[in-house]
């Protein structure tokens, strides 16, 4: 079939398998052209491995460090008449390119929050890898079925303690509008912490440790975003921020556990990028459109692969890691440069419907958004007939 982008709200409901493969290849080429990661990981588990930062971590480990990788994700395959999810196609492409390099790459499809998927992962590590020396935790999910209670909990994107009104960008209608959000209830805050906080990361590490599949010196990292003043009301000081603060608490006990075997655990702070998760946050499209404009002008613009490859090379496995006073690894320092933030803040209230494309890089934002789904990739013929039914050989599918 011929597949064109169809966008509804902050999701593109179509995906392009050939475009997704080309996007993965671009990221692999970036890593191989920037050289190996010295003393990098060799056997890696990535939880949330199919898109965005998790996919970038899998690519960086495999093609920057020659690592065997096991990826966990929750995606949907395509059929002859309907495209699958972008994450499915990304993972199929990743495994294809890894196999060409002689690297082990296997994937588990299912609910990473569940005990079942944790057990299947442990069994697969024992059978195929023995032990892992890096665990990357990169889940972004709107809800979680708690494995101990069976309760399904939802996360909420709301301010805490006060109602907030801020400028947003309606990406469908391409207009600036005021957005008002009521404060989260305590139940909504607790739910967001349960879904997006550190409990599941801790459950994963506990399960892996008890099963004896963590190598001596094993490291783990979970990805987070902090942002600057302009996003704080809705992000760091909001319900999501409460979940991110929970990561900072949970990492301490995880670090103690791994330190007993010479290992380490860190929260890694990454810059704002276009992802399916960030497009759902009302102020992020406007913030990102302004940020892209400023950072591209300064020559410091980065996407997922540049961020994560740099994180592994410079901080997780580097001699002089960027660490803040909380012990987090920082890869977001170019975004938080006072000059960059100052320019974004200065332009924030000046953007109008009329000057949107001049004042901001909304065009770049839209391109990045479509690239998530395999569109707007250079060299891909979008008028060609493609088969949406792409197989992942050897996938362990716990959803069937």
UniProtKB/Swiss-Prot annotation:
UniProt keywords, alphabetically: Fatty acid biosynthesis, Fatty acid metabolism, Lipid biosynthesis, Lipid metabolism, NAD, Oxidoreductase
Binding site for NAD(+): 48-53, 74-75, 111-112, 139-140, 244, 273-275
Enzyme class: oxidoreductase
Active site residues of this protein: 235 (proton donor)
GO biological process per UniProt: fatty acid biosynthetic process
Catalyzed reactions per annotation: a 2,3-saturated acyl-[ACP] + NAD(+) = a (2E)-enoyl-[ACP] + NADH + H(+)
Key word Ion transport present: no
The keyword Lipid biosynthesis is annotated on this UniProt entry: yes
Pfam family, one: Eno-Rase_NADH_b
Self-association state and partner proteins as the record states: Monomer.
Function description: Involved in the final reduction of the elongation cycle of fatty acid synthesis (FAS II). Catalyzes the reduction of a carbon-carbon double bond in an enoyl moiety that is covalently linked to an acyl carrier protein (ACP).
NCBIfam families reported in the protein's UniProt record: EnoyACPredFabV (NF043048), PRK13656.1 (NF010177)
Protein's recorded name: Enoyl-[acyl-carrier-protein] reductase [NADH]
Designated gene of the protein: fabV
């Amino acid at each position: 079939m011929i597949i064109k982008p169809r966008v509804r709200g902050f999701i593109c409901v179509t995906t392009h398998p050939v475009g997704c493969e080309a996007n993965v290849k671009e990221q692999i080429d970036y890593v191989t052209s920037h050289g190996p990661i010295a003393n990098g990981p060799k056997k890696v588990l990535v939880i949330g491995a199919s898109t965005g930062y998790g996919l970038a971590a899998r690519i960086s480990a495999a093609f920057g460090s020659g690592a065997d990788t096991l990826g966990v994700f929750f995606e949907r395959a395509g059929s002859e008449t309907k495209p699958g999810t972008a994450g499915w196609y990304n993972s199929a492409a990743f495994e294809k390119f890894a196999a060409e390099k002689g690297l082990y790459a296997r994937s588990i499809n299912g609910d990473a929050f569940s005990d079942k998927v944790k057990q299947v992962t442990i069994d697969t590590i024992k059978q195929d890898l023995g032990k892992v020396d890096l665990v990357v935790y990169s889940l972004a999910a709107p809800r979680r079925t708690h494995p101990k209670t069976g309760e399904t909990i939802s996360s909420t994107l709301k301010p805490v303690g006060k109602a907030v009104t801020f400028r947003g960008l309606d990406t469908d209608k391409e207009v600036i509008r005021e957005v008002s959000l009521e404060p989260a209830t305590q139940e909504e805050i607790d739910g967001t912490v349960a879904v997006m906080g550190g409990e599941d990361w801790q459950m994963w590490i506990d399960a892996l440790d008890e099963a004896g599949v963590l190598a001596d010196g094993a490291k783990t990292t979970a990805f987070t975003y902090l942002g600057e003043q302009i996003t704080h009301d809705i992000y760091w000081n909001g319900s999501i921020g409460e979940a991110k603060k929970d990561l900072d608490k949970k990492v301490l006990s995880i670090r103690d556990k791994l330190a007993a075997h010479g290992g380490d655990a860190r929260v890694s702070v990454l810059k704002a990028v276009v992802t399916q998760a960030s497009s759902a946050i009302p102020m992020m499209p406007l913030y990102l459109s302004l940020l892209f404009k400023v950072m591209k002008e300064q020559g410091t613009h980065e996407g997922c692969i540049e961020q994560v490859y740099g994180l592994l090379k410079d901080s997780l496995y580097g001699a002089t890691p960027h660490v803040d006073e909380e012990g987090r690894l920082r890869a977001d320092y170019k975004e938080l440069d006072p000059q960059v933030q100052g320019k974004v803040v200065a332009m924030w209230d000046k953007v109008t419907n009329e000057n949107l494309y001049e004042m901001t890089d909304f065009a770049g934002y839209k391109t990045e958004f479509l690239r998530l789904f395999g569109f707007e990739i250079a060299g891909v013929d979008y008028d060609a007939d493609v088969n949406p039914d792409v197989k992942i050989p050897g996938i362990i599918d716990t959803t069937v």
